Amino acid sequence: GLWEKVKEKANELVSGIVEGVK
């Protein structure tokens, strides 16, 4: 569903931010 896609994108964003901080 739509919510699953939204959560998926949020996880990608968070992962990208975490990688940038390292």
Curated annotation (Swiss-Prot):
UniProt tissue specificity: Expressed by the skin dorsal glands.
Job of this protein: Shows significant activity against Gram-positive organisms, but is less effective against Gram-negative organisms.
Coiled coil regions in record: none
Keyword Secreted: yes
Family of the protein in this entry: Belongs to the frog skin active peptide (FSAP) family. Caerin subfamily.
Location within or outside the cell: Secreted
Domain of life: Eukaryota
Protein name: Caerin-3.5
Entry keyword set: Amidation, Amphibian defense peptide, Antibiotic, Antimicrobial, Secreted
GO CC term, one of those recorded: extracellular region
Chief location: secreted
Lysine amide PTM sites in chain numbering: K22
Native source organism of the sequence: Ranoidea gracilenta (Dainty green tree frog)
An individual GO BP term: defense response to bacterium
